[in-house]
């Protein structure tokens, strides 16, 4: 989106970043694409008039890496959406994973560890928001095994539903 933004017409250009771009590209793409991302990252971040991020960890990393300032704008949680959620019964030892089925989200890490877990893991990778929230609400815990992350909405949703979260020590988790 940064490249499109460079040529977009507008009075002010704002780029919102969710995680460290070069690290995300490195984890998901070939070495040549990763090398290109690393070499152009600091230049690309000069194009917008304002940079924002929803993660204090991302804000800190970019300050240390490139001495670039980001505005911290936490992603809001629309609590009105939770008002119409049906009540559900807690399911003992149910563990919820809510997210994409992709490498950076670490779903493979959870699947590899599943045989060692004393509980039933429910994967919400292709469900409606309402269905995923019901599963979170009925679970004992939510697991966020991400390899990289800023501040996942899933964590905020689980906390709002009073469900504890176990996550990897990355980004804003």
Where would I find each of the regions flagged by the language model?
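Active-site proximal beta-strand in glycosyltransferases
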Residues: 8-26, 52
